[in-house]
Amino acid sequence: MKKLLFILLLTTFSFAQRKIESHQIINKEKIEGIINRIDSFPTKFIVPRTVDVWLPSNYSKDKKYSVLYMHDGQMLFDATSTWNKQEWMVDDVVSKLNSENKIEDIIVVAIWNIPNLRHMDLYPNKPYQLLSKEIQESIQTEVKKAKFPFDDKKINSDNYLQFIVTELKPYIDKNYSVYTDAEHTGIMGSSMGGLISMYAICEYPNIFGKASCLSTHWVGFRDFENNPIPESFFTYMEKNLPNPKNHKIYFDYGTETLDASYLKYEYRVDEVLQSKGYTSENYKSLKFEGENHSEASWQKRINIPIEFMFGKN
């Protein structure tokens, strides 16, 4: 989407005895829908942050919509305001899929990250707790060597999911014309957003019926020799993946830059999913040769997971 322009239309919602104010953002040059922005969504679980609710241009209260929750919300719609001048172009892709009658009607709820808290908000807590204290200490040694901002005492993903499930989703369900069941609710992200999306469908299978995890960051922070982190995720998944009869999961990866470090772990993803009864009907694990770890690469292929999750039968 080209640069977003603010329309001074303010809407105030009352939710759980709190007023949540949103304003519309519209691209006047080429409208690909409307964004209702909440600048600081009130929450008791995490640091308040911006939430964007994207609606198709023909949004109507007279019909119901499925909902896709996405992480790193500031990277999804407007390249002119992102740190690397790239975007997912979610509005354009969903609008195109709609115009081609390939997917159900959906809205997108985009949760912004707070850069210095992102890793702690999105790193799945329970897989990390499966590691022994000795292994956790060895990981922190590697973290210090890499000078990486990963403090395992501050992992906050359980609270992040609590925010989505108990505060954000009830607000969306109340204020938009949406289906509220798991069958019509998906969650999607890339890198750390891929990890938290996997974690979300495992922790809340009655809330999320679909998850898409692009360039999933199995290595945790950076890869190193005998890295125990990836296997902790796979062990967790073996115990917690939801019933394949009513859930869908999508994974993918490129082959360049950071994505190259995921190649050696993808066979384990396949092993785990297949051992839990997932088949081509409800699971995909795709390789994208030559693609790297960037919004530009994810933008090229997000139509695939979106259609996999919300495609018309």
Located regions from the model:
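Non-catalytic cap/lid and distal C-terminal segments of serine-dependent acyl enzymes
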Residues: R18-N313
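Bacterial Sec-dependent N-terminal signal peptides
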Residues: M1-H23
